[in-house]
Amino acid sequence: MDRVLSRADKERLLELLKLPRQLWGDFGRMQQAYKQQSLLLHPDKGGSHALMQELNSLWGTFKTEVYNLRMNLGGTGFQNAERGTEESGHSPLHDDYWSFSYGSKYFTREWNDFFRKWDPSYQSPPKTAESSEQPDLFCYEEPLLSPNPSPPTDTPAHPAGRRRNPCVAEPDDSISPDPPRTPVSRKRPRPAGATGGGGGGVHANGGSVFGHPTGGTSTPAHPPPYHSQGGSESMGGSDSSGFAEGSFRSDPRGESENESYSQSCSQSSFNATPPKKAREDPAPSDFPSSLTGYLSHAIYSNKTFPAFLVYSTKEKCKQLYDTIGKFRPEFKCLVHYEEGGMLFFLTMTKHRVSAVKNYCSKLCSVSFLMCKAVTKPMECYQVVTAAPFQLITENKPGLHQFEFTDEPEEQKAVDWIMVADFALENNLDDPLLIMGYYLDFAKEVPSCIKCSKEETRLQIHWKNHRKHAENADLFLNCKAQKTICQQAADGVLASRRLKLVECTRSQLLKERLQQSLLRLKELGSSDALLYLAGVAWYQCLLEDFPQTLFKMLKLLTENVPKRRNILFRGPVNSGKTGLAAALISLLGGKSLNINCPADKLAFELGVAQDQFVVCFEDVKGQIALNKQLQPGMGVANLDNLRDYLDGSVKVNLEKKHSNKRSQLFPPCVCTMNEYLLPQTVWARFHMVLDFTCKPHLAQALEKCEFLQRERIIQSGDTLALLLIWNFTSDVFDPDIQGLVKEVRDQFAAECSYSLFCDILCNVQEGDDPLKDICEYS
């Protein structure tokens, strides 16, 4: 045995078989270890392809060398036996495998010669007439129970019922490859020399065992070939040391049987695990389609669920039904579907689908397994307990709908629409301002100081506090306050943009005037006189100011290309900025700083989106008529914005964090000091108003601090009052003529024409406009 493999290959083979060195040559244990390691190392079982290939190579070499060693043991191989005999009348051809099969005359003669070399006192077993007449394969054994051997019987026995000699190995088809054989007849004559005492038993160390036959047994004419199942049987018994007799086919069959036997005994069968037979009923690839709507189909999700459905074989589902207690199911049921089974269970705690599947996969290493979470437990239970499903068992009698429904709890949430309506009614486009109002509304209404005063500047609060108090309480504990307010502000901007698209500029002007008249209508007597003082101040600002204001409003409303821009030019403190601010307040617009660098001008112009008018405030130029003025980049920037000023084509306006929007740039009111304008810029202004310093107007403002504190001069309501005070109601839109007349009558009741003339005289004299008329506080 030491010559079978090299020392390195022998140690490597024992290492792969995981056997100690002293078991080298014990073919039975080595073959058993080979089967175990093949299951572990096979790639289909999760093993290593390289190790499996190496093990097959070494094991194939080992078996081939053992076979060659056995055939040439002691220098006397079967090849040296006589090839013919006159006794049998059968002359085997060269290398005829069946000529030296177990029990034949040549087999007996060969081994008798072998034993005589080792034991000169060895004698062949005696031949009997009975054994000659009825030849069979058997061996002599020592009697253990009785000193006298039982008489021979002629009772035939099946080959499977023969007694086994412990010193001789069972037939093994997997030891040697199928040698070439000569086609012979099925009913060939049996050699006369092949008698029942054809040979003695052999010990593992080569010694002989002598005994007496227990009787000859007849064999069928065509004994079936030996086929190993699940691998080759061991070459020897558990106490053999490596030398044992191989197995051979007792009788050749037809061509199909020879081919099948050759394939089963081919050397390639030892190089890899034989392929598994395909299942007659392949495992399903998914749950039945009737359950699709009740299962979660998420694969890469860590979400936890309380209900699960496991799909496997019937046997595995029954086993899982008994062992699923690890998850402490509150309810579980076992159902059958076609050739498989399903386990449906609910737990009081939530688990991941992967955790349930990993636990079930320990019991389903071969059987198919599918596991999914159940999103609709009650509906799923109703389906799996009806046809075509079959309910087998459940731990409690069914599920009921009331187990999944709680008593309805009224959970009030913030009314987002109510917040949006509040912002839209008051034209609030600042999210923080909306949030501030609503947080203020959460206070108790009876104890609210702002509501008790009812001041004009607080009218948004005291008009809406009681209406929004309940919703504000919910808003106070809401986690989405900023989102709600941002959405409300976006709604105001969206409504404003929609108006610009759907309404004409005349309609927008009418709406703005209507809002101003409503505010004027709510003024008290003292506030009314204060606004009339502002009207008197404006009438002293420019000659025929009411007509000038009317022309400006008409110019800005009609928005004719190249005939729509207004320029206010004059020295410092001449009233330019105050009038421009009042126009912006009346019409709705924004003030822009155009003196910034050109790279920042794009975002500054983006503020003009959705505006009725804009104001370029305090534009600076390079050439000043007054040497005390500082130069700036405003006029140069205006010269680069000719398309913006003309209003003939749409321009792109952009804001931060938003896309560019293409629209016509709104008409502008530009204020500036005494700077020289180039002809290209001068041509863009259709109306130019030159302001001059009037000391009496400045003195009147200084002496009446309320005009400055309440910003009456910069208010658009002052200009609206000036219009209705100096023009008849026929000039206004018919829709607001009634309101115009009502507001005019209200102010006429507070201030007569003679009283207004007194206010006008006070302004022209540089005194307090309300001197000797009203004590304003």
Swiss-Prot record:
Residues 12-75 form the J domain. DNA helicase activity requires Mg(2+). Residues 288-402 bind DNA. Gene3D superfamilies: 3.40.1310.20, DnaJ domain, Large T antigen, SV40, domain 3, P-loop containing nucleotide triphosphate hydrolases, Zinc finger, large T-antigen D1 domain. A motif (LXCXE motif) lies at residues 137-141. A zinc finger (T-ag D1-type) spans 411-505. Its EC number is 5.6.2.4. Its cofactor is Mg(2+). It comes from the Viruses. It is found in: Host nucleus. Residues 194-204 have a biased composition (Gly residues). PROSITE patterns: SF3_HELICASE_1, T_AG_OBD, ZF_LTAG_D1. It holds the Pfam family Polyoma_lg_T_C. GO terms for cellular component: host cell nucleus. The modification N-acetylmethionine is found at M1. The J domain is essential for multiple viral activities, including virion assembly, viral DNA replication, transformation and transcriptional activation. Forms homohexamers in the presence of ATP. Interacts with host HDAC1. Interacts (via LXCXE domain) with host RB1; the interaction induces the aberrant dissociation of RB1-E2F1 complex thereby disrupting RB1's activity. Interacts (via LXCXE domain) with host pRB-related proteins RBL1 and RBL2. Interacts (via C-terminus) with host TOP1 and POLA1 allowing DNA replication. Interacts with host preinitiation complex components TBP, TFIIA and TFIID to regulate transcription initiation. This is Large T antigen. It comes from Murine polyomavirus (strain Crawford small-plaque) (MPyV).
